[in-house]
Amino acid sequence: MRKLLYIGLLGLVGILGFTSCRPSTPYVYRGLPKEYILAWEEIYGYAYDSVPGPVVALDLYSKGLELDANHRMRGTGYNLYISDIFVPESHGNDTLRLVAGKYHSERTGLPFSFLPGKNWDGQPTGMYVLYVEEGKLQSIQMLDSGYIVVKDTTSVMKDLEFTLYYRSAYGSRITYKPHFQGVLYPWEKR
């Protein structure tokens, strides 16, 4: 009887020892964030010969994720990136930046449009969401279509309402509606 008790205790200690030696599990995906708290507007100016107006990109960060002085991601959170946003020429001023209006996802290069997300040989382009954990990329969610409503709330503040779409792993279409309100920090990329 004691022999069975010792074997049972030994087995229990072995199981506890094994489970405590496992590496920590990565973040369990619970859905994309509804709010972004930091945003950079990358200003490319007149970047394409075939496109008449200026081009910008949006680089937004959720709580917990930030950029260091070298513009490298630190922390844990989400990064919504939308490249190739085609803004109208000047609008009566000298700006090359995002102006108020409704921008649609399409491949035309016309003002008030932006490119949809696409995976080019493992490289995300257009619009996508990165999940970063402790500065390391964990996942990429491509966004295939949608629109952005940009409002000026003050001379420096913007209100961005996104309605973006993507396909789930099972093929169903998912609507993603994040929001940002604040300053779009300019980052000259020309």
Q: Predicted regions: what is each one?
A:
Residues 1-4:
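Positively charged n-region of N-terminal signal peptides that target proteins for export
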Residues 6-12:
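Sec-dependent N-terminal signal peptides
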Residues 17-20:
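C-terminal motif of bacterial Sec signal peptides marking the signal peptidase cleavage site
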Residues 22-24:
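Bacterial signal peptide processing site
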Residues 30-48:
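Post-signal peptide N-terminal segment of mature Sec-exported envelope proteins
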Residues 42-55, 151-157:
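Short, ordered beta-strand-loop transition motifs
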Residues 51-151:
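Surface-exposed helix/loop patches within compact recognition domains
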Residues 149-190:
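C-terminal or internal capping secondary-structure element at the end of a domain, subdomain, or sheet
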